[in-house]
Amino acid sequence: PDDVAYRLNLVTLSLLGGDLCMEDFSAGHISTEEARELIACLQEEFGDDEFEFYAGVSYRHLMVWRGGRDDIHMPPPHDLTGQSVTDYVPRSAASMPLMNITNAAQLLFKQHPVNVRRETEGKHAANSIWLWGQGRRPQMPTLRDKFNLSGAVISAVDLIKGIGIYAGLDVIEVPGATGYLDTNYKGKGEAALEALQSRDFVYLHVEAPDEAAHGGSLTDKIEAIERFDKDVVGTVMADIASLGDYRVLLLPDHPTPVAKMTHTKDPVPFVLAGSGVDTTAAAAEEYSEVAARKSGLVVTPGHKIMDLLVNGRLT
């Protein structure tokens, strides 16, 4: 209970006009294989009874600070793209253990073979870590406790997997799931259908549209949404009726406008379809933010959307 988990991004920092800037929050979407070499190096050099490093996918990893503090705050690195990070680096005495690790990691990574090779290939080097988004183990009911349902989670993002584990969901690993544009969309849809043969519920998460928006690429975001529509939604909807009665709920977990390149707090549009769904309650002609606003249906608080999915009504 005293352990604190920090999200650890591999990032690219650069000097711009004398300021240290966040050039790339993903270190050029470094491959998982390359990233694991760097995280293994961190663990070998700095891992001990107090700090432990865990490799994830691409640039997303974890550091556990045993008996550590959870009140040292750094903003999400994707909110700092192109900006100076100088004013966001904590300088309190309490933050020194984290800053010491960050500085040591920069020295360690400088001549690491992974980064030497990436620079030779014209790619962004993972020349620093960024520790943020910390928290302690959550206390939460499982899906079985709350709804008496069995379930699974499918995602390339360890944060989503972790929440799923605490919710009592089985983690389904899909080969080729990268959390980026090149992820295995169709494989995720197929894995969801297979999981539903022996479970009541599947949470299927795709990170690609969010990543594209954080990168400020409208072209990439459109591609990600189109592939999600065709290869995830299309794959699931083509065969789900063969499993019997069903309900499908589709929605983003938050908006990430390309123009802002970060998350906003606006309500998200959702669509619910399947057995026992009242299609006249708030029918819309299309799936979009504009159509959702016109429907007049707002689910508040947002977590009540699960009641709508499971029970077919808001409770």
Label each PLM-derived region with a short phrase.
Residues P1-T315:
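Feature captures the catalytic ectodomains and active-site-proximal regions of enzymes
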